[in-house]
Amino acid sequence: MSLSKNSHKEDQLEEKVLVVNRCSKVVKGGRKFSFSALILVGDGKGRLGYGFAKANELTDAIRKGGEAAKKNLMKIEALEDGSIPHEVLVHHDGAQLLLKPAKPGTGIVAGSRIRLILEMAGIKDIVAKSFGSNNPMNQVKAAFKALTGLSPRKDLLRRGAAIND
């Protein structure tokens, strides 16, 4: 049996649980729990997605979050030599995120959530600092906004923008 192109692509994707949250509702018979999960999906080569889902069972929330993340996949075009071409500062709600390119061998210098996103995107050398809100969803959205807003080096050179080497 041969595999279709889509199933082959999905096999390469790595899925990580970023945050799991449990909520409880007090009802007549006791407490009723529900779960929410924030899931990251990436291939380490520039394809990245995130998904958020809720369910009454933890495994269902994780499964639904993974499906949502695969539907939300995006390609980060501006990656080069394991880093980003320029510095970027992004705001999303209360979260701010600063990403700076780093020299080869530096590694990923970032907090745990942002580090996981950058690793799954395939970035090897970068310095990141988050300010403001540490709400996981806001940090993830800020990171995706920063990564999708990057301009490739050739576009910057064509415009005549200054680039630090």
From Swiss-Prot:
Identify the residues that the record assigns to the S5 DRBM domain, covering every copy.
Answer: 13-76
Is RNA-binding set as a keyword in this record? yes
Cystines in this chain = none
Q: Quote the PROSITE patterns the UniProt record gives.
A: RIBOSOMAL_S5, S5_DSRBD
Enumerate the Gene Ontology biological process terms: translation
Name the UniProt key words of this record, in alphabetical order: Ribonucleoprotein, Ribosomal protein, RNA-binding, rRNA-binding
User: Molecular function terms in GO for this entry?
Assistant: rRNA binding; structural constituent of ribosome
Spell out where the chain crosses the membrane.
none
PANTHER family assigned to the protein according to its UniProt record, in alphabetical order? MITOCHONDRIAL RIBOSOMAL PROTEIN S5 (PTHR48277:SF1)
Record note on domains: The N-terminal domain interacts with the head of the 30S subunit; the C-terminal domain interacts with the body and contacts protein S4. The interaction surface between S4 and S5 is involved in control of translational fidelity.
* Subunit and interaction comment: Part of the 30S ribosomal subunit. Contacts proteins S4 and S8.
Q: Which family does it belong to?
A: Belongs to the universal ribosomal protein uS5 family.
Q: Briefly state the protein's biological role.
A: With S4 and S12 plays an important role in translational accuracy.
Which protein is depicted?
Small ribosomal subunit protein uS5
Q: Which gene encodes it?
A: rpsE
